[in-house]
Amino acid sequence: MTQSAKPVVVEQTGSEEDVERVNEFFNLRAIKRDLHQFTYRTTLDRAFTRGDRRLFYVEDDGDVVAALMMWCESRVLDADEAQIRLVAVKPEYRGRGIGQALCEAAEEFAVEYGESKMSADVMAESQAIEFWESLGYTVEKEWTTNNGRSMCLFSKAI
């Protein structure tokens, strides 16, 4: 795999097989452990079928090694805000700029859609904190979920 892997966009012209492959990736044990949540196929289907949402993925020899789901419209977002809902890279592929390339692709889509801010919810104790900071995101607010998980809302102007 090259250092500058270009993310593939899964949109209405993609296939159901693409969505299923991304679903399987997000639900791999190593990925779920980092995300600390289960990804529902119906959520990915909405990202596949709605014009304000996108799935991006990177593959190596036909294997999905990284993926991102984002959306530009939601009742929980400000009018000018897009959000990266999920982003993950297989552990053995981290440190190669793949996550950064996925986030840049999401930011580009959000700008094309007319958004000026990108956000991401991140667990406060996550190893991904440094990743988000390296991309220019800053903590906008901190809170605790109903089940006691400490979270940070990272955001940046795009």
Placement of each model-derived feature along the sequence:
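Conserved acyl-CoA
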Residues: 101-117
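A short, internal acetyl-CoA/4′-phosphopantetheine-binding micro-motif in the GNAT/acyltransferase core
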Residues: 87-94, 122-123
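Helix-turn-helix
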Residues: 128
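Residues forming the Rossmann-fold NAD(P)(H) cofactor-binding site
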Residues: 96, 100
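Acetyl-CoA-dependent GNAT
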Residues: 8-85, 90, 103, 109
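Conserved catalytic-core motifs of GNAT/GCN5-like acyltransferases
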Residues: 119-123, 133, 138-153
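Short, conserved catalytic or adaptor-binding loops enriched in Gly and charged residues
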Residues: 1-4, 46
